[in-house]
Design a protein with these regions (language model features):
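Extended hydrophobic/Leu-rich segments
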Residues: 6-10, 50, 80, 146, ...
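Exposed beta-strand-loop-beta-strand "reactive/processing" segments of non-cytosolic proteins
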Residues: 71-129
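A short, surface-exposed interaction/processing loop segment used at functional sites
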Residues: 117-162
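Short, non-transmembrane alpha-helical segments in secretory-pathway proteins
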Residues: 33-97, 160-162
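Sec-dependent signal peptide cleavage junction
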Residues: 22-36
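N-terminal Sec-pathway targeting helices
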Residues: 1-15, 24-26
Length: 162
């Protein structure tokens, strides 16, 4: 009899805890403020260029190197290399110079990558790279399938006209 009473009390206590947890979780959800719609991205009217080659030229050229003749949704942001590398690939890099972080979409295959014999080349729907502001040298490059929706955390994002 005593055991039945203890088990009954335990069951009631568990039910109350589960109900309280569900109420707490749902209250938290209802109080969240929905994220505002992203502001339209301004198309850059002037692009950085070095020795007659613009940032757009660099993006289109590297897309072509990776098999994509018509990349879409090309964007860039002026930032520092440390911040860009951390966002784009989670890396800590050896310099923190001013740079442009560039992201574009398409179907990319890096056939120029060094890889073991028989290995498949890197592929991705997103190309991300970092270009040094001072001379246009590409310091970082990668392919993946990430959208980089939070590129605006690095600064003002601008679109590159197709």
């Amino acid at each position: 009899m005593k055991r039945r009473r203890v088990l009954g009390s335990l069951a009631v206590t568990c039910a109350v805890l589960v109900a309280a947890t569900l109420v707490f979780v749902n209250v938290g959800r209802s109080q969240r403020v929905p994220k505002a719609e992203a502001a339209p991205i301004e198309i850059a009217t002037t692009l950085p260029s070095w020795n007659g080659m613009s940032l757009r030229d660099t993006a289109v050229q590297w897309a072509a190197f990776c098999g994509e003749e018509h990349p879409t949704d090309m964007r860039f942001v002026e930032t520092t290399r440390q911040r860009a590398a951390k966002l784009l690939d989670g890396a800590k890099v050896d310099s923190d110079n001013a740079c442009y972080a560039v992201v574009l979409h398409g179907n990319f295959v890096d056939t120029m990558a060094f890889m073991p014999y028989g290995a498949q080349p890197p592929r991705g729907t997103t190309m991300a790279f970092i270009v040094r502001s001072s001379d246009g040298a590409m310091t970082d490059f990668g392919l993946n399938d990430l959208p980089y929706a939070d590129l605006d955390t690095l600064g003002t994002v601008k679109a590159i006209a197709p």
